[in-house]
């Protein structure tokens, strides 16, 4: 097994699309999307897949480097001349949002062909079944026709169709793509992998003695094979997957942080795999775009919202001074609950030193349709800031995100890489900020050092008076937020008839809906309770509200606003 390394900064942009073996009809489709050059990872992967058979491929490259098109272009070109329609390409991704995104990429490059691509996991199951398979059965004879060539799916959904959709099969599959491979190879996803591999019926026994073929490029860029006889007798079955065999199915693994755990990779039964990476593996473990500037700010816990406001202010102020559009900002938190509460607070504040901004919550508490709508508005500059849980940390491709903020320090380097990788994509410049609590600084620095990264980390030190301009608006927003949560708490008391069921709210658990929805719900609850309690609830409500606000002022927020 040979690792093929290439430099991320290879400057081959003068090469034409034709020079990479891309056919004219496909070039026209790419040019319609203003794609006239390939990025480095695409320059390596596209021609390699076009001219190579029988090798599985693992690609470890930074987020935003163009990995999706790197495999979509050659795979479409490989199957476009098929005669009988079968499921020949299956792309597995971890989230529904990524399913939609990858499907759109395929749709954009298959124009003018009769290829059909279908996303699984987005539509109702019974509708997907009708779009996948046509039943021509008569009597006791079962005859099924595949209606698609390419499927893009989450792991669970493809397993559902394997088990429950009559006529659906992967035995004709030519290419299995596992995007965000490091996440999908985690233990919780192992069952789907075995089911999918088994369903391809591509298993074959390896002989005890085989020829391992090592591959590298010569000075002319041609592939050279170096044969080396090896014995597998003492290496157990875990090493069998690394050797050459006659194998129909080709597997492609892609991620910004690729695992090298043999026990996990062995489940894939890789065939003579080749590893593509952006730099020498011995020198760097986690590759980041060279166009990304990484910063961190050390802060006290209660100061974090003010640090966030200053980052927003600095980002908006620079663009405003230059007469440019507002920067697109993504702010990551560690939970859905904090995402909701931070979004509520920022909505109430609404501006930083007279610079207005708009923000929305993007988390798993929203439906797929709602998240898609938010992304569309974000792309159209109708939203300045998305407050996100980690649902958006992987794979979501929005080209012009300028700033990524880690409101909470990521617990591991893998998550950090995927978060900050939302900016500085496709050769654009971007900035990331990580707000590090004083108690976490040693862990954070240690984590970044162990990652053996090549980029410089910039520590920003802001004087306390920098935050003074935000103090009044922050306090006002926080007080309004406490009032809203207090009203919600009292409504819950009124609904439940006692004080024993409100402990969860004091811990800051998630409250559904925006600030406006909360207030509307309060009004509806008030009307219902008035009728049910013979118009006595309003007076009781006012008494409880005054009591609650008094307790808040005395104890400095009985409700925990740990944001």
UniProtKB/Swiss-Prot annotation:
<dbReference type="InterPro" id="IPR027417">
    <property type="entry name" value="P-loop_NTPase"/>
</dbReference>
<dbReference type="GO" id="GO:0005634">
    <property type="term" value="C:nucleus"/>
</dbReference>
<keyword id="KW-0539">Nucleus</keyword>
<dbReference type="InterPro" id="IPR000629">
    <property type="entry name" value="RNA-helicase_DEAD-box_CS"/>
</dbReference>
<keyword id="KW-0547">Nucleotide-binding</keyword>
<dbReference type="GO" id="GO:0003724">
    <property type="term" value="F:RNA helicase activity"/>
</dbReference>
<dbReference type="GO" id="GO:0005730">
    <property type="term" value="C:nucleolus"/>
</dbReference>
<dbReference type="InterPro" id="IPR011545">
    <property type="entry name" value="DEAD/DEAH_box_helicase_dom"/>
</dbReference>
<dbReference type="InterPro" id="IPR014001">
    <property type="entry name" value="Helicase_ATP-bd"/>
</dbReference>
<keyword id="KW-0690">Ribosome biogenesis</keyword>
<comment type="similarity">
    <text>Belongs to the DEAD box helicase family. DDX51/DBP6 subfamily.</text>
</comment>
<keyword id="KW-0347">Helicase</keyword>
<keyword id="KW-0694">RNA-binding</keyword>
<dbReference type="GO" id="GO:0016887">
    <property type="term" value="F:ATP hydrolysis activity"/>
</dbReference>
<keyword id="KW-0378">Hydrolase</keyword>
<feature type="short sequence motif" description="Q motif">
    <location>
        <begin position="15"/>
        <end position="43"/>
    </location>
</feature>
<dbReference type="GO" id="GO:0005524">
    <property type="term" value="F:ATP binding"/>
</dbReference>
<keyword id="KW-0067">ATP-binding</keyword>
<feature type="binding site">
    <location>
        <begin position="61"/>
        <end position="68"/>
    </location>
    <ligand>
        <name>ATP</name>
    </ligand>
</feature>
<feature type="region of interest" description="Disordered">
    <location>
        <begin position="493"/>
        <end position="537"/>
    </location>
</feature>
<comment type="function">
    <text>Probable ATP-binding RNA helicase which may be involved in ribosome biogenesis.</text>
</comment>
<feature type="short sequence motif" description="DEAD box">
    <location>
        <begin position="179"/>
        <end position="182"/>
    </location>
</feature>
<keyword id="KW-0698">rRNA processing</keyword>
<dbReference type="GO" id="GO:0006364">
    <property type="term" value="P:rRNA processing"/>
</dbReference>
<dbReference type="Pfam" id="PF00270">
    <property type="entry name" value="DEAD"/>
</dbReference>
<dbReference type="Pfam" id="PF00271">
    <property type="entry name" value="Helicase_C"/>
</dbReference>
<dbReference type="InterPro" id="IPR001650">
    <property type="entry name" value="Helicase_C-like"/>
</dbReference>
<feature type="domain" description="Helicase ATP-binding">
    <location>
        <begin position="48"/>
        <end position="276"/>
    </location>
</feature>
<feature type="compositionally biased region" description="Acidic residues">
    <location>
        <begin position="495"/>
        <end position="510"/>
    </location>
</feature>
<feature type="compositionally biased region" description="Low complexity">
    <location>
        <begin position="520"/>
        <end position="536"/>
    </location>
</feature>
<protein>
    <recommendedName>
        <fullName>Probable ATP-dependent RNA helicase ddx51</fullName>
        <ecNumber>3.6.4.13</ecNumber>
    </recommendedName>
</protein>
<feature type="domain" description="Helicase C-terminal">
    <location>
        <begin position="308"/>
        <end position="482"/>
    </location>
</feature>
<dbReference type="GO" id="GO:0003723">
    <property type="term" value="F:RNA binding"/>
</dbReference>
